[in-house]
């Protein structure tokens, strides 16, 4: 089962009262959330946008992450993933067709010691640089907001995997506009300690296609993690919409040793 703890703190403005009220709600989510097939979740919409999956293999030995990008415009579809050190970056498949590199050219994956950072934008660099200065994942993301691509205001989604001394944990974050209102940024972090074998979580930018595109809602989806790296990679790629999928990155990390293997799939070849 999953336990979710939500803490809300209300502060009264200075000068009126020094009172504050704190409420804590602990809720057992077992009856409210069911684990679903990742394949079915991926194939259920034509345009989830960009997505991050993090979890653990069925044998419990490997930490898993996947990151995919999709596109509707020629500029968005004109991309490939390429290796960049221990991570990856996006680059234009045909440089002559690149119109606007902002928001589409970035490093989705970087490695900082025993931490693997996966995001849908240049906040990868923000997390890397500020965590390297001893700030936390959440503190780093406090300096960022959703993307300025009105009217969509695409959420910034991020994940971090921590492997140390045979232990594995991860966290996911989403920064999004306040129900389409860019005046406010809503910030959510979901932390998962001691991940269970054969399970993971999936977060993506959009609930589906639309105009404007509807931002992701709720908690990251609780999903099955199945197969070896090639089987998992094939399953994800095959269940993304054929017209809109662009690139996929998958990494399996040995929790005992920290060694990893990766796969990259690009539609543009």
Regions found by a protein language model. Name each.
Residues 30-269:
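Conserved short alpha-helical segments that host acidic/polar catalytic motifs at enzyme active sites
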Residues 12-13, 28:
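Generic detector of N-terminal low-structure segments
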Residues 1, 10-11:
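Aromatic (phenylalanine/tyrosine) cluster motif
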């Amino acid at each position: 089962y999953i336990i979710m703890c939500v803490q809300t703190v209300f502060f009264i403005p200075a000068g009126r009262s020094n009172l504050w009220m704190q409420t804590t709600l602990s809720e057992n989510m077992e009856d409210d959330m069911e684990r679903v097939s990742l394949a079915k979740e991926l194939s259920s919409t034509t345009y989830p946008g960009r997505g991050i999956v993090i979890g653990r293999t069925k044998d419990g030995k490997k930490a898993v992450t996947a990151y995919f990008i999709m596109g509707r415009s020629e500029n968005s579809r004109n991309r490939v993933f390429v290796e960049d050190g221990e991570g990856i970056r996006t680059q234009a498949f045909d440089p002559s067709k690149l119109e606007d590199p902002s928001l589409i050219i970035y490093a989705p994956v970087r490695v900082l010691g025993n931490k693997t950072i996966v995001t849908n934008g240049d906040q990868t660099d923000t997390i890397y640089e500020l965590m390297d200065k001893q700030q936390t994942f959440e503190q780093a993301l406090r300096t960022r907001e959703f993307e300025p691509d009105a009217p969509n205001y695409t959420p910034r989604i991020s994940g971090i995997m921590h492997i140390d001394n045979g232990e594995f944990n991860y966290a996911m974050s989403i920064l999004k506009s306040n129900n389409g209102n860019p005046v406010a940024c809503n910030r959510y972090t979901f932390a998962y300690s001691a991940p269970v074998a054969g399970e993971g979580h999936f977060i993506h930018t959009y609930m589906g296609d639309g105009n404007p595109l509807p931002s992701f809602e709720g908690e990251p989806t609780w999903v099955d993690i199945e197969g070896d790296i090639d089987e998992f990679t094939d399953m994800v790629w095959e269940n993304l919409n054929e017209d809109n999928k662009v690139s996929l990155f998958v990494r399996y990390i040995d929790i005992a040793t920290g060694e990893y293997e990766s796969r990259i799939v690009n539609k543009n070849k």
